[in-house]
Amino acid sequence: MIRLCPITHGNLWQLAALDVLPHQQEWVSSVSVSLMQAYCTLAGGGTALPLGIYEDDVPVGFAMIEFDDLPDTENAPIAAGNYCIRRFLIDARYQRQGVGRRAFAALLDYIRTLPCGPAPLCWISYHTDNPVAARLYASFGFVPNGEKDGIEDIAVLKL
């Protein structure tokens, strides 16, 4: 069973050790970099929720949710008042086993509880040369909106 868990001193190093396949590293930042980004967001007064993804008691992935505009950074127009799945990764050892699909469903279920407050939309960005991610997000109802977050395409889901 998939569980989403907060990052603690007890699981930090297990989660930091998670990694994607070598060819995927250009598409997603590491857990360590993600945690630094979360720290900067939180220290600046923004909202970031880094989460470990567990299959039973085994850490299999990492996700990070953000809410609203981020402080001290250029924000995509869609960011204002909405949720963002800033990071989603499944460790290389657990890919191609359905873990990613189950984890993404659990993450969306959590976001739909509106943990940071009400919002009409959730958005995610991805590299155009990552068709697996594009198909996964589309299968959950995310639709490209024509905007970019840096060099990444943005897709949006109504909550």
PLM region spans:
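Short, well-ordered turn and helix-capping elements at secondary-structure junctions
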Residues: 67-69, 89, 128, 141, ...
